[in-house]
Amino acid sequence: MAMPTIRHVRAFIVRGGGADYHDQPGGHWIDDHISTPMARYPEYRQSRQSFGINVLGTLVVEIEASDGTVGFAVTTGGEIGAFIVEKHLARFLEGQLVTDIEKMWDQMYFSTLYYGRKGVVLNTISGVDLALWDLLAKVRKEPVYQLLGGPVRDELVFYATGARPDLAKEMGFIGGKLPLQHGPAEGDAGLRQNLDKLAEMRSRVGDDFWLMYDCWMSLDVPYATRLAQAAHEYGLKWIEECLPPDDYWGYAELRRNVPRGMMVSTGEHEATRWGFRMLLEMQCCDLIQPDVGWCGGITELIKISALADAHNVMVVPHGSSVYSYHFVVTRHNSPFAEFLMMAPKADEVVPMFTPLLLDEPVPVNGRMKVPDAPGFGVRLNPECALVRPYAR
């Protein structure tokens, strides 16, 4: 069978949830008083939206093949990403065989090197790459995980990220990751409140349930060290993304400082094999958390995972729903997955990209069999208003 070529590439934007999961209405736990790099300024401390965390919005990339098959994916990128796709990246895709994903990734990355490398450009490349994998799998009438070598386990097991680990335990998750609420600018009183919250949750969940703290790039080495050492009393399993992503030296120091048995994790805001090579070779962490929608897509995550495996470091992708599920189920060094609790009070399981995607699977009792529908197995919700700002 002759493989089809790529006929059209289209980029859309949408507001209100979706891949930009911070784009939520008021009262959501994800926009509460959470420690951030901007929390050093009191006026930006109470809400993450106050400093613009949700300004980008969701980017939807749609790729149509010459046989009419359509692949798509969503990521964070919004109108900036749509511009990059339509004005720059589309030229490297249209007319190419749907199988030539490695070549297309290479051309997208190196053509944007002078203004890209990380951030919104890599988010955009990631979205295109995921759409290419969705397209190829649909052409072959297979789930993406079969293109990646097939599953190595029957089902995924999950920990939950959200404000209520105690409720996550009742729902069957293996652990709960809390957002850290107070950073260095709030002093010893804030540190005490962080520890009190951890102690409260430990008393609720017992000793056999993982508890972790997500620090979202907001700490420095001295504060993170104090937090880790004091939190050890409450059995903190790992401390996540304490420092700015580029502070590899700080991460290496922190990993030496934390109590024995506690893990340091990071990588949510890192990109490409070269960024993760720094983390791995400098022994910055015990597990890495690439986001497949930001780090370079499936094509790059394959390389990142192989690097980590050679360093005996686990790969636990950040969020990203079906895009990470199809990868995690195929890799031994990804023994569990993250589920982001998108219910406003973190009190029920709802799809991560709701309301944008239809057929998006969710864990039941903390477990999931990855669906075997072609591609990533999801559809765009026709009730979500997509806008194509740079139609060609």
UniProtKB/Swiss-Prot annotation:
Cofactors required: Mg(2+)
Taxonomic source organism: Paraburkholderia xenovorans (strain LB400)
Cofactor note text: Binds 1 Mg(2+) ion per subunit.
Protein name: L-rhamnonate dehydratase
Enzyme class: lyase
Other comments on record: Reaction proceeds via a syn dehydration.
Record bears the keyword Metal-binding: yes
Binding site for substrate: 22, 48, 338
Active-site residues, record numbering mapped to chain: 318 (proton acceptor)
